């Protein structure tokens, strides 16, 4: 039941693994990482189906007999032929039971997590490899990953790797890597270590890269089952995930600016934000709502996910007494005007319908959705009218019936949202393909007066509700601000506090200079992020690695990196710092339904920016780079990329960071400026003034009257 306001069940944040019979010991002998795939087989089905962690839904790839044979043949190539008879039968059972060969037998018996840098450095031959291994293991931490045993970090199918043999090979290569080698990762498969140079990346990652005509969801299901491709989401497959903190800041900025734009307020006390999802990304929503001062109500059908976020302190209260009880609790919380997050155990459609039917005042001010609708038929969306378990069972037993249930649920979902929006609630698409999939389901999401979409026509990019990029984040990206993050490889909370102080000092400097220049829009962004970083240590954000995130522009990112590199050099920090960013950024992602949805020159569907960004980061010395198909809105809908860079205190790592970060931001600013975005044009002009070597092609605006006259008749 929902607790009363004075008896709220608020759990303190914790970063400790759960104690249970399935808990694995910490890794003691790190030399095991050097061994790779063992010559002798571990015990059969070692550690399979740990009941204390969530598991990925069963996949239904619909392989032909020839396809099944190929999947097994591909899986067995990691192993000596003497083991094939034993493993073939076992892998066939996994394929037919789970829809994928995870190779559970080879799952490590030790706890996977971001151990202190010194532990990895003792078995690795270079700092860069040790940091990469730390980041990979953080993505597979049971506290961090959504489905750790299936190597899924977030988003329902955001894979780190395809199977456990790949993890063993990857760890071995990273232990062996030197500073004149580069590791190539092909959709989870470690293709090998290649001679390169100290100036080249230590690792190049590609995930889901396919010939464009073969990028349907059915293509993905087949290729994933056959072990030849993975959906890396964004930071799952690039090994840069930092737990729900990775998105909580962006969510905070979004909700804060939604209040300013839609409600005309800076203070969200007594305001209510309703959404869904408590997974790896969506789990940031309740924490973000509290940070902004609002009441956040987040629905989640998977009880394990809800209880996990509650235990970690990311949800204040659990409401498991039904939708009407939740509405009553929200009414009281709204009146109390105190920050509060409520995790509703149930389907968000039922919750939306209860709010729509509630008498009296409008209870919901702001609304969105973060179900994994990039994968609606593979477990990313739970249809209303079915329990969580019943929905998963139907998905496997009768896919057409499940599809019909999802589409009917989406129509109900949208109808309830529309009813509340008609009364004044403001709703936006959170870049999870909600409006796209709702339109495909026949829901009423197109603008008034829009003709129904013809079969086979291009998907719409304009709906009755905006994406959060179109209305809020797009202009922030265009200004050059985006999610910059870092990980203190020492794992020391003291090091993290020192880096927070470094970042805060930089933001003050950048803000003051921008204000003096008259660039108030830059200074205002710095002010929001300064408040965030000054308070971040008190919000219990760390889950997994000692990481932090904030939004900064080109100048801010480069200066923060320089100061942190200096701190490593001077011994102020005990170990290197890994800098990175979300792929959801200024330059990293081409996605017409999210990151580039506010690009209006017709190039929203073009992927040059993301591809150029990855190549450019590699050319300028990033420690590793990644390029992915999919991420956020789904396979075939997005091209995105990211990087990781190790600041080891050397002049070389500092110079590489300065060059790479300048490109990593100005690339996207340039593209957005060429598309005639005002903030981007402003940022591009400032960038050229600051760096004389930067020469950008500037657009000239055409007069509407000239265009009309030219096309008349």
Regions found by a protein language model. Name each.
Residues 233-239, 243-253, 260, 267-272, ...:
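Catalytic or ion-translocation cores adjacent to nucleophile or general acid/base/metal-coordination motifs
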Residues 130-131, 137-149, 191, 221-234, ...:
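Catalytic cofactor-binding cores of redox enzymes
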Residues 332-338, 344-357, 680-712:
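C-terminal domain-closing interface element
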Residues 305-308, 437, 587:
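Short, charged/polar "capping" segments at the starts of alpha-helices
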Residues 290-292, 357-362, 443-447, 568-569, ...:
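Short, solvent-exposed amphipathic alpha-helical segments in soluble enzyme
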Residues 182-187, 205, 275, 298-299, ...:
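General beta-strand structural signal in soluble alpha/beta enzymes
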Residues 2-250, 256, 260, 264-266, ...:
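N-terminal ligand-binding/catalytic initiation module
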Residues 324-560:
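Core active-site phosphate/anionic-ligand binding loop and the adjoining beta-turn-alpha structural block
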């Amino acid at each position: 039941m929902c607790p009363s306001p004075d008896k709220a069940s608020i759990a303190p944040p914790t970063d400790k693994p759960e104690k249970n019979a399935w808990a694995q010991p910490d890794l003691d002998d790190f030399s095991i990482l050097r061994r790779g795939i063992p010559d002798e087989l571990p015990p059969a089905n070692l550690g399979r189906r740990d009941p204390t962690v969530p598991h990925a839904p069963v996949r239904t790839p619909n392989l032909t007999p020839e396809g099944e044979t190929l999947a097994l043949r591909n899986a067995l190539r990691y192993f000596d032929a003497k083991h094939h008879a034993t493993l073939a039968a076992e892998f066939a059972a996994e394929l037919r039971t789970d829809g994928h060969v995870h190779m559970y037998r080879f799952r490590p018996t030790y706890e996977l997590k971001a151990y202190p840098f010194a532990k990895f450095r003792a078995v690795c031959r270079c700092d860069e490899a040790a940091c990469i291994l730390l980041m990979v293991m953080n993505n597979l931490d049971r506290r961090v990953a959504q489905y750790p045993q299936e190597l899924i970090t977030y988003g329902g199918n955001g894979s780190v790797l395809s199977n456990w043999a790949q993890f063993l090979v990857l760890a071995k290569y990273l232990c062996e890597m030197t500073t004149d080698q580069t590791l190539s990762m092909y959709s989870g498969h470690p293709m090998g270590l290649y001679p390169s140079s100290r100036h080249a990346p230590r690792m190049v990652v590609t995930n889901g890269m396919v010939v464009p005509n073969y990028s349907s969801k059915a293509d993905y299901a087949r290729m994933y089952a056959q072990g030849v491709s993975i959906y890396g989401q964004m930071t799952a497959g690039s090994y840069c995930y930092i737990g729900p903190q990775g998105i909580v800041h962006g969510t905070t900025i979004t909700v804060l600016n939604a209040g300013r734009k839609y409600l005309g307020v800076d203070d969200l006390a007594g305001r209510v934000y309703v959404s869904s999802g408590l997974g790896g990304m969506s789990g940031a929503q309740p924490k973000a709502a509290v940070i902004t001062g609002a009441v956040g109500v987040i629905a989640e059908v998977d009880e394990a996910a809800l209880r996990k976020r509650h235990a970690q302190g990311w949800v204040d209260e659990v409401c498991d007494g039904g939708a009407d009880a939740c509405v009553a609790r929200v009414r009281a919380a709204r009146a109390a005007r105190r920050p509060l997050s409520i995790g509703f155990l149930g389907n968000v459609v039922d919750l939306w319908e209860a709010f729509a039917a509630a008498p009296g005042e409008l209870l919901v001010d702001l609304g969105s959705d973060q179900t994994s609708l990039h994968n609606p038929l593979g477990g990313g969306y739970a249809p209303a009218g079915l329990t969580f378990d019943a929905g998963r069972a139907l998905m496997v037993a009768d896919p057409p019936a499940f599809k019909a249930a999802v589409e009917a649920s989406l129509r109900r979902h949208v109808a309830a949202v529309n009813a509340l929006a008609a009364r004044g609630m403001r709703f936006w698409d959170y870049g999870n393909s909600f409006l796209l999939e709702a339109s495909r389901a026949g829901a009423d999401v197109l603008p008034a007066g829009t003709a129904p979409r013809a079969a086979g026509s291009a998907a719409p990019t304009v709906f009755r509700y905006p994406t959060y990029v179109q209305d809020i984040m797009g202009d922030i990206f265009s200004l050059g601000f985006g999610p910059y993050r870092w990980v203190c490889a020492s794992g020391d909370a003291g090091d993290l506090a020192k880096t927070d102080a470094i970042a805060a000092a930089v933001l003050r400097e950048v803000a003051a200079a921008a204000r003096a220049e008259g660039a108030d829009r830059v200074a205002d962004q710095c002010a929001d992020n300064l408040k965030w970083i000054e308070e971040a240590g008190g919000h219990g954000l760390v889950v997994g690695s000692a990481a932090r995130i904030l939004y900064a522009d080109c100048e801010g990112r480069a200066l923060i990196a320089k100061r942190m590199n200096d701190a490593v050099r001077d011994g102020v920090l005990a170990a290197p710092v890994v800098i990175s960013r979300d792929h959801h950024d200024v330059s990293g992602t081409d996605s017409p339904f999210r990151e580039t949805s506010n690009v209006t020159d017709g190039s929203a569907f073009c992927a040059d920016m993301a591809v150029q960004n990855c190549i450019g980061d590699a050319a300028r010395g990033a420690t590793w780079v990644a390029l992915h198909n999919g991420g956020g809105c789904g396979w075939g809908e997005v091209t995105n990329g990211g990087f990781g860079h190790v600041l080891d205190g050397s002049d070389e790592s500092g110079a590489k960071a300065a060059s790479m970060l300048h490109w990593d931001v100005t690339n996207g600013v340039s593209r957005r400026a060429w598309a005639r975005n005002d903030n981007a044009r402003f940022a591009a002009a400032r960038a050229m003034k600051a760096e004389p070597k930067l020469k950008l092609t500037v657009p000239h605006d055409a007069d509407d009257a000239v265009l009309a006259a030219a096309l008349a008749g």
